[in-house]
């Protein structure tokens, strides 16, 4: 295919209007890099019947910097009143700032050590063979959700399921996802079912942990005596008593007294605790599984990753992981809806007017291959400029827990790469869905 050919666009233009987006969706899912390259070169803003794709770095960053115009309105019916469903308003600014303070970046060395220990224990117990998605990629972040975020007292499999269906409905059940009506109803039903269970759990968690905080603070002797009776009753009923408060996110939030004017009461604490869970598990699992497969499929970079994984200094290894994610991101795009008419690429030959209510896909994977920003974009070059990656989003809706993810994701991959002769017999099985569901790995166990 020469530089002037338009293999994809020729088919797109020739297709019937009703068939155009199905073609686009198929190419995005099965051959994204050559498709996006052609768009960047020949039609960087592609208008389809369902949505508009933006493929240049400058256009992607422009729209993601305008949250009141390019909104997350499509999140709102799925997320309820969580801060990420709000666009540049008081609640979003206030709660994201509060939560970023709680997620103290000074914790990160300890968080990475925690992740490493969890990961090593799982791999050691596996003794050379593991189904990595369910027994590792999901299990490590689920354990961190309990131990660091403080969502204890629930089965890890429940935490995983609650995260899974929230993520599925919010990010993969949108107008530009090609699904049957039956499948859409199933996703919504499972989301509703798991959200009800999550809500009940969060309520119980808040009550239980608030009692512990109040007793710890010894606000009054009678309350401390009551809490002692509560523990005795649990013991007599055969229930495990809490061993005391640890330093985790839930404890930090409940230990902190906020003035009424800050509007961060126990209900808001609970909503934000649930948000930590939902955002942590499935995204991490997908990123880790896909990076592992990417490296196993490329002997040159596998060898370099395995060598770097042995070093205590992790910068070299982490750079390999982030560059791999450029090629296999958890999603090739973000999505927004316009609240007002806007011209993207104004003053250029690609200028396009987007009417109110347009669905817009800033194609972040394509932006990470834009030669205007990424030198030699088709080459695998670790240690690129971190700020040009979109692995945790961009702008006001950049991932709340990105700094946790920045140590958790590479450390999980690193522990796998430290295993002797790690290998896979098959590709990741997505089971016709958006997430990795099965991926069997083997290595030479020392046990």
Name what the model sees in each region:
Residues 1-447:
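Cytochrome P450
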